[in-house]
Amino acid sequence: MKKTALYPCHEQSGAKIIDFGGYLMPVQYAGIIAEHKAVRSAAGLFDVSHMGNFFVKGSRALEFLQFVTTNDLAKVVDGQAQYNLMLYPSGGIVDDLIIYRMSADTFFLIVNASNADKDFAWLQQHIDQFEGVTLEDHTERLSLIALQGPLALSILNRLFPSIDGEALGSFHFCSASFNGFDVIIARTGYTGEKGVEMCVPNEAAIALWEALMAAGAADGIQPIGLGARDTLRLEMGYSLYGHEINQDTNPLEARLKWVVKMDKGHFIGKEACEQAMQHPQRTVIGFSLEGRALPRQGFTLYNSDRQAIGVVCSGTLSPTLQEPVGTCSVLREYGKPGTPILVEVRGAFHAGIIRSLPFVTNTSLA
């Protein structure tokens, strides 16, 4: 089992450790609800170093990435990042990822931990068509730290006085120096709150983590585990691979049509997307339940006649709303907000309604 460079920090903080994506990762520290509320009200620090990260380099790097992804990277400038998708020819999703343009011939990719090996192999499979383009896996060399919450940018400024996080702008990044090491600081996140995600060499990771915790101590910063990371992203309706998106889900079903630019050149899966637009079958949408029954992935959704209409993708008790919420994949005719549904939980039917996403709208990013 792998450990991130920050594993000693998690042990010292008394975190509960689990296996996630082949890494020993903290699922919680003080508790999922307390950590969730800390991020919504103040700030939290996340170790996301298990995420895969690759460099794509070469004079045809942009051309290569345009071919294997759906969004239009030609519109991205140096210092800017873009949310993107890789598709199979069938239109199913290989993975979702963020691509950072370092320069005209250098791009930095962050992919899901559970998909890192698969993604690297997928990219390697297609790279030979683009002479001179190289693919480098830096996952074992770099640590990724996310600082998120309404107070995150002011905490960042205490440690890096020359960086104005507000001025940097969403999905933009810059470079800074910490203890003689280069740090990439990006205005990205997975919580719905203001914040940054930082990439630093493993050698400097513990010192940076401790410095950020010290800088935010007066504001109540807390270390945050994967449990609260999941409840935070679910309240926002953000997709998680293996739940809302997978190899059998196309971007249109997953509410990710905005990431697919049909007016750019050819890309893998383009024809399948064109067909899916003509004959949409399902949609991923939110829902909530009455009572306290918790919906879990794989549970069946029914209409009022108890006919199966879909399946739960993700579910939890929302710490902010204090009610059971989730995402589901349903037949499109049942995907309108306000539609009554039933969810079978442990053999009993529980009433609910289809809800629009996000569930929580009054965040610091809103």
Curated annotation (Swiss-Prot):
Pfam families: GCV_T, GCV_T_C. GO terms for molecular function: aminomethyltransferase activity; transaminase activity. Signal peptide: none annotated. It catalyses: N(6)-[(R)-S(8)-aminomethyldihydrolipoyl]-L-lysyl-[protein] + (6S)-5,6,7,8-tetrahydrofolate = N(6)-[(R)-dihydrolipoyl]-L-lysyl-[protein] + (6R)-5,10-methylene-5,6,7,8-tetrahydrofolate + NH4(+). Its EC number is 2.1.2.10. One of its GO terms (biological process) is glycine decarboxylation via glycine cleavage system. The keyword Transit peptide does not apply. InterPro entries: GCS_T (IPR006223), GCS_T_bac (IPR022903), GCST_C (IPR013977), GCV_T_N (IPR006222), GcvT/YgfZ/DmdA (IPR028896), GcvT/YgfZ_C (IPR029043), TrmE/GcvT_dom1 (IPR027266). It comes from the Bacteria. Keywords: Aminotransferase, Transferase. One of its GO terms (cellular component) is glycine cleavage complex. Belongs to the GcvT family. The glycine cleavage system catalyzes the degradation of glycine. The glycine cleavage system is composed of four proteins: P, T, L and H. This is Aminomethyltransferase. It comes from Chlorobium chlorochromatii (strain CaD3). The gene is gcvT.
